[in-house]
Amino acid sequence: MVRTIVCDLDGSLMNPSSGIYVNEAVKEALIEVEKKNILVILNSARCFQGVYPLSKQILMQDFGCNGAHCLDVKMKKTMFEYVISNNDVSSIWQYAQKHNLGVGYSQPGYFVANKMTHGFELDMHNCDVDYILTNHMEKYLKDSVWKMSISDSKENIDLIYDSMKDHIESNCNVKVVHSTDTMIDIIHKDCEKLNSVNRLLKNLEISWKDVSSIGDGSSDASVLEASGLGVTLENGCEACKKVAKKIVPSCYEDGCIEWLKEL
């Protein structure tokens, strides 16, 4: 019996980079699932601002989780978080500045960056998050940092990625992830989707066998494999298709609805 569903967003519940809300048909299907007393967990690499509006759209009353920050939506209370230290934020900022790269860090109400790039512009619109541009990194560093990003052209990112990853991971307590062609995401080294969901399920005393999950990216594969019913889409990566117990039509066809209606 499925007690909980774990949902990736971009490429699963919605088309990649398509804004902060799901299509109306997907919204209604998710609400019907919630009416069956099935717990919904949103498990996205997006920053908080790109996930929270969706939780309100689908009338979520329980938990939202983007890996680095797990929020009880009903109580508006942080359950746990994986925080990048201020020293590491400063070190990464200085490294990016030295190499003339765009760099920024998350805050609960905004994102702070040294300059606007194409990648940051896409993120600003996709997550509906306000960007503050500054040369003074420490001025706006008021709360926990759950994610940093480095952004530049695809050519520059491809050129510097390997050496940048080695340098940053060797000197800071973080993990460097090639997120998109123009964006590098940086998170705490212990933060990943599987670890975060596992930690949440233990808190809630829910077994993985009672979980159904959906995802399309490589970071989703371990979650699908651990779940009682792991589902991917036709647009899913090979790693997801290898471990999924069910494959539904692509996100461009709202394939997740087939899965939601069968729960």
Language model feature labels by segment:
Residues 22-120:
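Active-site phosphate-binding/coordination module
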Residues 226, 234-263:
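Asp-based, Mg2+/Mn2+-dependent phosphohydrolase catalytic module
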Residues 3-19, 224:
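Asp-based phosphoryl-transfer active-site loop
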Residues 1-7, 35, 206:
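Non-catalytic pre-domain segments flanking phosphatase-related domains
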